[in-house]
Amino acid sequence: MIKKCLFPVAGYGTRFLPATKAMPKEILPIVNKPLVQYGVEEASAAGIREFGFVTGRGKRAIEDHFDISYELEHQIAGTGKEEQLQSINELINHHTFAFTRQNEMKGLGHAILTGRNLIGDHAFAVVLADDFCVVEDGDDGVLAQM
């Protein structure tokens, strides 16, 4: 069983301009969650618990999203909004997230090779976080079907 997943998220997001000029495309919201979180949730549903991200300049928001925000939690404590962070906090608490930077943009293959230090010699899945796959209730996600 595959236990690791790599997200090559270093690209410039030019297909989504001007929305991605100052925000990574992977953080663009789909309803109430960023696009990349849907990919992580799908991989998690397939039994994957370790995630590696190959990032680039301007992608710090992805790292911040998959990290605990003590300041935000403190600010919303007692407001009734704590539940809104529940889905991301469950991912953070039950999974491992690691990040490395692709210093030169040389394409998808190079990004995956750059992630080797996160994955090692283990079998792994690759999820392209700008591909949004809709799964009907009760159906397995794309990774679980493989």
Identify what each model region corresponds to.
Residues 71-75, 82-146:
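Conserved beta-loop-beta/alpha segment of the NTase-like Rossmann-fold superfamily
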Residues 1-77, 81-82, 138-145:
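N-terminal glycine-rich phosphate-binding loop and ensuing alpha1 helix
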